[in-house]
Structures are given as C-alpha cells and as structure tokens.
Curated annotation (Swiss-Prot):
Gene this protein is translated from: PAP14
Pfam families per the UniProt record, alphabetical: PAP_fibrillin, Pkinase
PANTHER family tied to this protein: PLASTID-LIPID-ASSOCIATED PROTEIN 14, CHLOROPLASTIC-RELATED (PTHR46699:SF6), SERINE/THREONINE-PROTEIN KINASE STN8, CHLOROPLASTIC-RELATED (PTHR46699)
Key words, A-Z: Chloroplast, Plastid, Transit peptide
Protein's name in the database: Probable plastid-lipid-associated protein 14, chloroplastic
Keyword Chloroplast: yes
Domain comment as written in the entry: The protein kinase domain is predicted to be catalytically inactive.
Tissue expression notes: Expressed in roots.
GO BP terms, alphabetized: response to osmotic stress
C-alpha cells in the first residue's frame, strides 16, 4: 500500500521554529492565529526559520533557508494528505486490534474520493480529543515526513500515516483526526490469544519453504514446538528490522508493545505501530552537553526499545505471561535486582510445567543449548549498556535457523556448556554415561572461566545458589532400607558479603537443606511427614590461588565405582581437537589454572523440625548420607573454579565439584 498522490496541500498548524535560551535545540511552537493557511500562499513563499537566543549566534544561525529540494518542507509535506469527513464512508464496526486510548475515538472507514490513490481502501480514523493526544498525532506526521524518504522500508515495517482531516468552522478547532492505514484486524497480542493461532498465523503470513529459508530453516510442518519456533523467528526478525530502521534514522519508538504491533496480510510484514511517541536521539539536548552525554542519551533510548522487544519476545514464547498477574511477577523479579540470566530458574518454578510434554515455551528457549534464554537475558539486561542491539540480535543463534552458520562468541559457548550441564542434571538419571558427560562439561566450563580474579568473585558470589549436581558419591534410597526415611527438598547455599569495602574479603556461607522426615515403615504415596531444615553457617576468606593438574597415571576404576573415570584425560583429548583449539585461550592442556581459594573458619550447625520425632539423630544421619558431605561440613569447600551471573562451580577437598545455579526462590520454599 504505497502513497501515490496528494489530495491537497496540508493544512497543519503553522509551526514557528524558535531557539530557547536554556535549550539550544530547535523546538516547535504552534501559532493559533495562523491555524488556517491557504495552500497558494504556502507554496509561493520560501520557508524561513527565525531563530532567537540571548546567546550570540553566528549569522548563519540567525536565518536559515533550506535550498535543498530533496529535503525541503514543501516536498516532505507533499506526502501528507488532507481529507474531509465527507471523503469517507464510516463503517459500523471497529476491529479489536485497533482499540484506542481513553482520549481517542477510533473509526474504520472506506475512502470514497475517486481521484484519491486510496480509493475504496480501508483506513483507520483516530479522533484525538486532548492536547496530549493531538501532540501524538502531529508527532506521527512529523516522523512520517522524516522517514518517507526511504519509502520501501517505511511502508514495509511501519504503520502508514496517510494524513489528517481538516476541521470545518462548526467543528472543534482544537480536535485533530489522524488517518492511517488498516493493517489487518488483529494486533499480535490478539493473534496469540486465538486458540488456533499457529495454523491461522501461518496461513496469514503464507509461510512456505521459501519463507522459512529466509530465517535459515528448510523444513515445514513438524511438531508444535518446531512450528512455533519458526513463527517466532519470522516475527522477531521482522520486528527487529523495523526497530533497527527507526534507530538508524535517529528515532526511538518508546511504545513497543504487542498491542501496537500489527501484521499486514497484504505484504506479510510486521508494522511497528503509529510513531506518535517516537523520540529523537538528539532532541532537547542541553546546550552544555557534550558528545558523550548525547551518545549516552542515544544508548539509553535504544536500550529502552530493546527491553520492550525483550518483553514482546517473552510473551510470544511464554504465553503464560499474557496473564497480567504472572507478568507482574516477572516485573517484580527484575525490579528486585535479580539478574535476567537466571530467568529460566524463575520461569520453571513459576509456570506450570507439570504437563506430560512440559511447557512449550520453555522447550523452545531450551533448544540450541539454551540460546533463547541467552537472547532473552540480553534483551532485558539490568544495565542498559549490556543490552543487545538490533543488528547483533539478528545474528544471534536463536533467530538463525540450522542452515545458517553462525560463529558463536565465547559468551555463547560458555552459555551452551552451562545450559547442557543443567539439562543433564535435571534428567536425574545419573548412570555412568551421564556422570561422565557432566564431569566433562564442568571441566570445560572451568577451562573457560570468564572471571578468574578474586575481585570479580567478590562481586558475583553474593546471592542465593541452588545445588544442581555433585560429581562425588550419590547414595539414594533404592538399595537401602533405613529406619527413618528423609525426602530431600531444595538445597541452597546463601553467600553474603560482610562489607562492601574492596579490602574486605570476608564472606558468610549458609547451607540451607530442607527435607521431610518420614517415620512410617513403608513409603506413603502422599509423602507426608515432618518438615525440617538443616543449616550450616561458616565464615570464609577469599584469596587468589591456583588449581594444579597433576600428570600421573590413572588407576583402573571398577565398573560399579561412583568416581570420575579419566575426566581430566578425556578433557585433554577434547581440547586437542581442531574445533576447541580455536576457542580455548591456550594451545595445550595447562598444568594449573587460577581459582578463588576459600579459607574457612568455624562452623555452626542447627536443625529445626516442625513436628516432634523420636530419633532426630537418625534423621540427621540419613540427610547427611543423601546430600554431598561438603554441604554439611562447609570447611571441605576449598576453591571456586567457575562463576558467572548464572552458574557456580566449587571444588572440594576430595576433588569433587558442586554445580550451583543462581536462585531467586523464597527462603520458605521447599
């Protein structure tokens, strides 16, 4: 749907450009006495900007005449159409996707002017009744005139603004009616609320093999997870291209929501909504500002748009977030300062994942070694400077199909190793192949530790960590008949820093083991018993250290042993391959690696039980058999070998490793 002609010269309110004393940027002021302006006089005179300021200006700034015909005001205004109410046939319905705000009246109409290039086409009329709403409408026209120079991209990724309706003498002179394109009946939010949205949206977008090849995939059909992933890739790439188009023109959308994004059934492109609140990167910059502050403003506005895109992606993948209550939990999770890299831990415990096939959205984000979680964490990162840009997001593995070869960064490689280790630990089938793979992945993570210095550990260690896996001995209940059975719940390690001082390296470690003691002879089906909590508290000092890799002959390990058979030897063979030589920062297996050494102090152990039991000693003994001994005796923790914003690996005296994930669970949760 292209703009092919003009009805008449626009009759927008005359804009007088002024330069304020405090603000050197150019602003706009409406002159009510010049509300009506004849088109003949408008075209006959040159466009002169009168600028005034108490500061001394150069002569070139006092009076500026733009002689470039390609960017003249008259040429830009030629694309804005001027309508009358009689030019439309108002329909008796309004599609749900065009719902307006409280200060708007929304109509759907058909253009009835035979000479108009929009003849017999559907449009949307937005009557803006308040000053703030009118400001949005006029801003949308200003942005349209700025972007229309590149019509192809504008028409493909932005909702088309055609013009406005002039006011008759009998009409309210302060009302303003915007005329823009009608791109389907639904916004993306309303599409996702349909029960059969996947096949319906596939049909609307006319997705075929050629369409999927554009996102790096050459398959069609398949299970619902694969179909939804291909749809999300298509929609997200279109959204990012449209948002990047705005950012490259010095504009930020500032209102990116699912309700404002539409899908056109004509060109099958995403329309990023009316740009009534679009903001200029360089607008309203104080005169005392420098290039750094201008760039900082630009980054902040781009980061705000990327955060909005991240929320849109989260709702498209995890449709439970369409519920305002669940979405409020997500906003609260982020507002409390939790790192977005631990979103998976939050969602798995918040969403309903008890169905037979699991949660579809979680499965989509888990694919490709957790690439979806990585992209989502970058889009809604806590610090604006850490959020990903549109161009980098378009090259992210999650949005690139299997046929596209994407060179992963070191950060993505570490993320993939950690995500794979987490997935294996969740299977809870700890036979020898799984144990070998987990030990192998943990060893690779330690080789690629991004934060070897103790100062980084002091910043990242504080928090609440949930135990995922131990490479040491595992003693369960299958082959034993204990007198008192204990069902282990969550095991957490809470680390707090004594002081924020740089020289203070003291840390407080608290091991929190929650369990249920079952005193009956046989296992009951409902697993009801006396709830208890075992806590161990110890103080640690953090200093720099090294972990030595001793090159000595390995002893043969029996078939039924629970140790780590040739973990370091297999790791050394892996690092010698051509694939890993390009990734690891060293050419051969190192003899030592820097670690964060932990020096422990005294230990304090407490146990609380909700109900009275006859033999608390036997309960403690049973709990100690099932958990890693290092979680009971914290003095056996000797060093930290890997840490990032999501995962933690601690090594023990006997050489075993403990894998933790950062948790935001309530202290009262089991």
């Amino acid at each position: 749907m292209a703009l092919c002609g003009v009805c008449s010269t626009p009759n927008l309110p005359n804009l007088q450009v002024f330069r304020s004393v405090r603000n050197s940027s150019i602003g706009y002021k409406r002159n009510h006495s010049l509300w009506q302006l004849r088109s003949s006089s408008f075209r006959a005179k040159s466009v002169i900007f009168h600028c005034s300021s108490s500061l001394r200006q150069s002569p070139s700034n006092v009076e500026e005449i733009d002689d470039n015909p390609s960017v003249s005001l008259e040429d830009e205004s030629a694309h804005v159409m001027q309508f009358k109410w009689s030019d439309f046939r108002i329909l008796d319905r309004v599609s749900i996707g065009h719902g307006g705000r409280a200060d708007e009246l929304v109509f759907e109409a058909i253009v009835q002017v035979p000479d108009s290039p929009l003849f017999n086409q559907g449009v949307v009329l937005r009557k803006l009744n308040t000053t703030r709403a009118q400001r949005r409408g006029r801003r949308a026209i200003e942005v349209f005139k700025k972007l229309v120079r590149r019509r192809l991209l504008y028409h493909s990724y932005s909702m088309q603004v055609h013009g406005y309706i002039t006011n008759n003498l009998s009409d309210d002179q302060y009302s303003f009616t915007l005329v823009h394109g009608c791109h389907g009946s639904f916004s993306i939010r309303h599409w996702l609320q349909q029960s059969d949205w996947i096949p319906t949206l596939e049909a609307t977008l006319a997705l075929d093999e050629e369409s999927f090849r554009r996102v790096g995939d050459d398959t069609t059909g398949g299970p619902a997870v694969s179909r939804q992933l291909r749809l999300i890739r298509t929609l997200m790439r279109d959204i990012l291209i449209g948002v990047n188009y705005l950012h490259s023109h010095g504009l930020a959308h500032t209102e990116l929501r699912l309700e404002n994004v539409h899908i056109s059934p004509v060109d099958r492109h995403i329309k990023v909504g009316i740009l009534g609140n679009a903001a200029d990167f360089n607008g309203d910059v104080p005169s005392t500002s420098n290039a750094y502050s201008t760039m900082d403003r630009r980054q902040m506005m781009i980061a705000f748009d990327m955060r909005c895109v991240g929320f849109m992606m989260a709702k498209m993948v995890l449709q439970e977030l369409m519920d305002p209550l669940i979405f409020a939990k997500l906003k609260s999770f982020l507002a409390k300062g939790n790192d977005p890299s631990s979103l998976r831990e939050f969602f798995v415990t918040t969403l309903n994942t008890n169905s037979e096939s699991g949660n579809t959205g979680v499965q989509i984000l888990d694919r490709n070694w957790g690439a979806g979680w990585h992209l989502l964490s970058l889009l809604i990162a806590t610090r604006p400077s850490e959020r990903i840009s549109c161009l980098d997001a378009l090259k992210h593995p999650f949005l690139c199909g299997p046929r596209w070869r994407v060179a992963p960064s070191m950060d993505i490689i570490r993320w993939g190793l950690g995500s794979t280790a987490v997935k294996i630990s969740e299977e809870y089938i700890y036979r020898m192949p799984q144990r070998q793979r987990l030990a192998h992945f943990i060893g690779l993570m330690e080789m690629l530790n991004p934060y070897p210095k103790p100062n980084c550990w002091l910043e990242l260690l504080p928090g609440r960590w949930r135990l995922l896996y131990s490479t040491g001995k595992h003693i369960g209940l299958t082959l034993r008949q204990p007198s008192t059975r204990a069902l282990i719940g969550n095991v957490h390690l809470t680390i707090t820093r004594a002081s924020e001082s740089i020289n203070n390296t003291s840390l407080s470690f608290t091991s929190d083991i929650r369990f249920t003691a079952i005193t009956s002879k046989d296992w009951p089906h409902n697993k009801i018993g006396a709830a208890g909590k075992l806590q161990t508290l110890s103080q640690f000092r953090l200093i720099a250290g090294k972990r030595l890799y001793l090159k000595e002959e390995k002893k043969n390990i029996g078939k039924f042993s629970m140790g780590e058979p040739d973990a370091e030897e297999g790791l050394a063979e892996k690092l010698e391959t051509e694939k890993w030589k390009k990734v690891v920062p060293f050419k051969e297996f190192p003899s030592s690696l820097p670690v964060a050494k932990l020096v422990s102090g005294e230990i304090e152990v407490t146990m609380n039980m909700n109900d009275h039991i006859d033999s608390p000693g036997s309960v403690i003994g049973e709990v100690r058999k099932q958990i890693p001994p290092e979680m009971f005796d914290l003095s056996k923790l000797v060093c930290g070998t890997y840490i990032d914003s999501r995962l933690l690996v601690l090594r023990c005296v006997n050489g075993s490793a403990l894998l933790f994930t950062r948790s935001s669970l309530d202290h009262k949760s089991m």
